[in-house]
């Protein structure tokens, strides 16, 4: 029990996140290959002295594989529970779970919150899995609003996703680095990708990490196993732009009533959408304009 002066011994961890206040959140602890009992998240203050961090507390309700923190809220991928957990960490000595939700493939790898704090995006580290978006404006009633695959039917595996403004940038193993426009989180659209691995399908080769927050605007992505069997660091410029969205309502010209199940097509594209019960439709194409 660290509060009585003893220490938490660990020799490795799956991931670490350091927030804007210099608090390190250590996820998935092991000690010489054995899981540490309190392996959810350990909170350490590394701001004053990174070589002699101060223990602040821990959250040990479930195993956390990966997570991030903004302000007083932790967003955690509890992979073996297959759930997104949202935790109030304002009191590091007594963190409290305030919301949770299952993810599409029940193997929640990571989570990242939108800039406005109203949405969270998750990945499931499974074959043919999804990136998913959730409305968390009410943490007591979290709602999935969209899910998307980079290459449907290919069995590729998403790994880590990051929100960068209106874009979602994801390491996607054998599908490389993918970029989705999330201007409308309920209608994500892929606008760019670079596949650094020649193979396809199920497997843990190719891109397994990406970082889009450099001041240069460049994106760095790491391949754990490139085409020659070695790791590679890739640096990408930003040659992508936001998608073009089309949305509206269809009404009966005589009665003014909404028309459901009306088919809407964007000419010269394969896009086809059907209006809902309120006559609403939404579509998008990659090309801006």
Predicted regions and their residues:
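Feature marking well-ordered beta-strand scaffolds used for ligand recognition
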Residues: 1-242
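Detector for glycine-centered tight turns/loop "hinges" at secondary-structure junctions
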Residues: 22, 217, 255-256, 279
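Short, solvent-exposed loop/edge segments of extracellular or virion-exposed proteins
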Residues: 151, 197, 249-255
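Hydrophobic aliphatic residue packing
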Residues: 163, 221, 250, 262-264, ...
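Phosphate/pyrophosphate-recognition segments in soluble nucleotide-handling domains
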Residues: 236-250, 260, 286
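Short, ordered, surface-exposed loop/turn motifs in non-cytosolic proteins
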Residues: 246, 253-268
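Short, acidic Ser/Thr/Gly-rich low-complexity loop/linker segments typical of extracellular
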Residues: 258, 266-286
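Exposed beta-strand face motif in extracellular beta-rich ectodomains
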Residues: 289
């Amino acid at each position: 029990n660290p509060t009585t002066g003893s220490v938490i011994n660990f020799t490795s961890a799956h991931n670490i996140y350091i927030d804007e206040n210099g608090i390190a959140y250590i996820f998935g602890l092991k000690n010489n290959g054995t899981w540490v009992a309190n392996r959810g998240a350990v909170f350490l203050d590394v701001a004053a002295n990174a070589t002699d961090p101060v223990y602040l507390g821990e959250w040990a309700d479930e195993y956390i594989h990966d997570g991030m923190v903004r302000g007083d809220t932790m967003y955690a991928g509890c992979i073996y529970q297959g759930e997104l957990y949202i935790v109030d960490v304002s009191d590091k000595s007594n963190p409290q779970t305030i919301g949770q939700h299952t993810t599409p493939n029940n193997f929640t790898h990571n989570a990242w919150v939108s800039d406005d704090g109203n949405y969270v995006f998750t990945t499931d580290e499974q074959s043919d899995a999804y990136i998913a978006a959730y409305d968390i404006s009410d943490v007591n009633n979290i709602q999935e609003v969209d899910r998307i695959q980079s290459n449907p039917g290919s069995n590729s595996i998403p790994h880590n996703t990051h929100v960068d403004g209106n874009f979602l940038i994801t390491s996607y193993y054998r599908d490389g680095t993918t970029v989705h426009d999330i201007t409308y989180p309920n209608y994500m659209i892929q606008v760019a990708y670079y596949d650094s691995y020649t193979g396809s399908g199920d497997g843990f080769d190719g891109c397994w990490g990406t970082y889009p927050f450099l001041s240069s605007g460049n994106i760095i992505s790491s391949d754990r196993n490139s085409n020659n069997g070695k790791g590679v660091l890739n640096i990408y410029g930003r040659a992508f732009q936001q998608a073009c969205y089309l949305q509206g309502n269809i009404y009966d010209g005589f009665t003014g009533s909404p028309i459901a199940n009306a088919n809407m097509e964007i000419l010269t594209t394969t896009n086809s959408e059907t209006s809902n019960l309120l006559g609403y439709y939404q579509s998008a194409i990659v090309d801006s304009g």
